[in-house]
Amino acid sequence: MKLLLLTLTVLLLLSQLTPGGTQRCWNLYGKCRYRCSKKERVYVYCINNKMCCVKPKYQPKERWWPF
């Protein structure tokens, strides 16, 4: 019974403490954050003034247009 009460308490606390998740950007390939991880790059900025951190494989390739 004590184990059940402890488990329910922990689950209740975890459901209250965990955020809903980060806002998604760049066609759901990026995440809006204040700092990007080492494997991510900033490509655009989100509406909430955070950086849209996108992994390099999901960013468009740069094309050089001849003039």
Curated annotation (Swiss-Prot):
GO terms for biological process: defense response to Gram-negative bacterium; innate immune response. Its main location: secreted. Abundant expression in the male reproductive tract only. Abundant expressed in testis and the caput region of epididymis, but low in the corpus region. Residues 1-20 form the signal peptide. It is found in: Secreted. Pfam families: Defensin_beta_2. Disulfide bonds join C25-C52, C32-C46, C36-C53. Keywords: Antibiotic, Antimicrobial, Defensin, Disulfide bond, Secreted, Signal. The keyword rRNA-binding does not apply. One of its GO terms (cellular component) is extracellular region. The keyword Mitochondrion does not apply. PANTHER family: BETA-DEFENSIN 123, BETA-DEFENSIN 123-RELATED. Has antibacterial activity. Belongs to the beta-defensin family. This is Beta-defensin 123. It comes from Homo sapiens. The lineage of its organism: Eukaryota, Metazoa, Chordata, Craniata, Vertebrata. The gene is DEFB123.
